[in-house]
Amino acid sequence: ALANIYYDKKKYSEAEEWYSRAYKNGIIDAAFDIGNMYFNVEAYEHCLYWYEKAAKEGHLKAQNNMGVSYFKLREYKKAEKWLVEASDSNLPIACFNLGVLYTVLRDEESACRYYKKGSTMLEENCKYNLAIINQNNKNEKDAISLYKYLHKIGNDKGCFNIGLIM
């Protein structure tokens, strides 16, 4: 709790000191928190160090964030490794991030596979991106179905796009 107070006051060295103490006492989330602190100031090399400590202990969000950090560093193979690991453990946001990675790599088939997987876990952004792909591929029936779902749950982008199609 003290680490969070320092973090909120942007006293990062003090926050890191207290998070480190917590980590040394067996609190894996503390390594994740330090990773987030560095991620938020775009110090990706530092955040990776801390995320890896948590990720190797099975912390799914740390695995996902390692993938995102590597993505930002354009180290796509490393990003893929960590995102696949988190996605294989059914973390919905990892499915979305993996879909984005495959979209950037122009592997639409793999992107769709992970967007579909995330969609089954009700990850809105997966449904939206899958709808866009369906729309771009002239599969309006599936696109409309996804946009209707997004409209029903109040997703603004889904509401806007269904209006464009219909």
Describe these PLM feature segments.
Residues A1-Y7, D29-F39, K61-F71, I93-V100, ...:
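Conserved alpha-helical positions within TPR/SEL1-like repeat arrays
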Residues N25-I27, E57-H59, S89-L91, M121-E123, ...:
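Short helix-capping/linker turns of helical repeat alpha-solenoids
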Residues H46, W50, H59, W82, ...:
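Polar, enzyme-active/binding microenvironments
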Residues Y114-L122:
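TPR/TPR-like (Sel1-like) alpha-helical repeat modules
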